[in-house]
Amino acid sequence: MTRVSLLWAVVVSTCLESGMAQTVTQSQPEMSVQEAETVTLSCTYDTSENNYYLFWYKQPPSRQMILVIRQEAYKQQNATENRFSVNFQKAAKSFSLKISDSQLGDTAMYFCAFMK
């Protein structure tokens, strides 16, 4: 069975708008899983905003950034897109990406992003 490498840089990004800073942090530097396994990537963020969007992007070896999934903060239901789903915990400021049935094509660097 082929190994799927989910390399992801430790990313801390800050978005400055209206004098307020929003910080997004990913804690896991790299993950490798067997093909067909399920993997969860974690992200936390800090904001005082009530209405915002969270995104997961992937950057495969071709270097292009691809939107995987997005979550609106005002929605209670977690977003789902094919084999990708999120666990959005607004009170805990946590936003995890779950990749089910991982495939070789999932090999990429993954980024969590925030937008007001």
Swiss-Prot record:
It holds the Pfam family V-set. InterPro entries: Ig-like_dom, Ig-like_dom_sf, Ig-like_fold, Ig_V-set, TCR_variable_region. It is found in: Cell membrane. The keyword Zinc-finger does not apply. The keyword Transcription does not apply. It comes from the Eukaryota. Its main location: membrane. V region of the variable domain of T cell receptor (TR) alpha chain that participates in the antigen recognition. Alpha-beta T cell receptors are antigen specific receptors which are essential to the immune response and are present on the cell surface of T lymphocytes. Recognize peptide-major histocompatibility (MH) (pMH) complexes that are displayed by antigen presenting cells (APC), a prerequisite for efficient T cell adaptive immunity against pathogens. This is T cell receptor alpha variable 38-1. The gene is TRAV38-1.
